[in-house]
């Protein structure tokens, strides 16, 4: 899907729909960072992988890994969703994901930000478009950016 994606819906209704879709995905909204009145919703970090075996594979899906030799133990992403009003009923919705992996080198482990592959953004946009339009879309496709 294009990102930003144009949706026909009143902005306040769209913000409410975004909140509902996030709840359905069990992703919590960071109330302190979000500004719904300005059309900005920020989520709390969503852990999508735990454990070294699963995390390595899931991070390869959600991120572009520069170095494959890190010992990843967890993966998480934070979504920033921005609704920009075009006119009374049309809005552009852009979704950006900050993807992080918890990497360890034996003595310490720390969260490292890695480049998003676009999968987290695509998965959310597909669910949002389905919620707004009522039409079921195909599974998310990876696209060259």
Tell me what each language-model feature is.
Residues 1-145:
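Ser/Thr-rich, low-complexity intrinsically disordered terminal regions
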């Amino acid at each position: 899907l294009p990102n930003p994606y144009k949706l026909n819906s009143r902005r306040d209704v769209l913000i409410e729909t975004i909140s509902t879709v996030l709840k359905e995905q069990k992703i919590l909204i960071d109330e302190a960072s979000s500004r719904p009145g300005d059309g900005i919703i920020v989520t709390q970090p969503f852990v999508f992988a735990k454990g070294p075996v699963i995390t390595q594979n899931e991070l390869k899906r959600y991120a572009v890994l520069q170095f494959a030799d890190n010992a990843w133990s967890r993966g998480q992403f934070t979504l920033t969703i921005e609704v920009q009003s075009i006119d009374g009923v049309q809005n552009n919705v852009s979704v950006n994901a900050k993807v992080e992996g918890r990497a360890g080198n034996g003595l310490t482990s720390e969260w490292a930000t890695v480049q998003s592959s676009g999968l987290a953004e695509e998965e959310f946009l597909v669910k949002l478009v389905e919620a707004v339009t009522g039409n079921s879309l195909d599974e998310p496709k990876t696209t060259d950016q």
